[in-house]
Amino acid sequence: MNILIFSDIHGDLRALEKIARRQADVYIAAGDLSNFGKGLDRCGEILRPLGKKVWVLPGNHETQSEIHSFCQRYGFIDFHRQLRPLESASGPTQWAGLGYSNLTPFNTPGEYSEEEISEALTGLDGIKPLYLVVHFPPLNTTLDEFAPGKHAGSPTLREWVTRNQPAYLFCGHIHETAGRSDRIGQTQCFNVGKDGYLLEI
């Protein structure tokens, strides 16, 4: 089974068309299809033929209600704060989705405090094997370094991953680090960006 995870399209329809042409069993949009909610319907028309193969998270540019309505209109799966099973070659896996970002200086519509992030992750403690898709990166990795020595990730997410060691973490949000990977213990971490990351399970 092939899973294509991508993020931060921000209304770039050409990039989204490239994603839609790729072959996958599941397509996970890890937030920020739009710019402040504008252009979601244009994205929906491109992805509509894929139907329930498309799982969607809100980024910090979208609200949960916008993404829920968007998924209802186009027949997609609202993946925000959901746990969904997928069968891999080696057995069952669990996929968890968490949208929004940690707090930013920009007061965007979809932001969580560290306390809210902790509350959202608590229900995932101990689930194995877990594949975690979030919009925002963990702190102090190659994925959240937006300028040399400057990091914008979530300390709460970092601590949770260190403690729980999911098999994979996929994120976006920091455009400057799209395509980079890192490890936290045994957890493989990827900033998927708008070009996406294809995982075979």
Model regions: which residues?
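Divalent metal-coordination and catalytic microenvironments
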Residues: 8, 27, 32, 59, ...
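Short, conserved loop/helix-junction motifs that constitute active-site signature segments
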Residues: 46-51, 125-126, 161-164, 184
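Binuclear metal-dependent phosphoesterase catalytic core
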Residues: 15, 69, 83-91, 108, ...
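Core catalytic region of metal-dependent phosphoesterases/phosphodiesterases
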Residues: 6-88, 192-196
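Short acidic/histidine-rich motifs immediately flanking catalytic phosphotransfer sites
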Residues: 23-26, 127-129, 165
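Extreme N-terminal starter segment of soluble prokaryotic enzymes
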Residues: 1-4
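Active-site environment of divalent metal-dependent phosphoester hydrolases
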Residues: 10-15, 34-38, 60-67, 102-106, ...
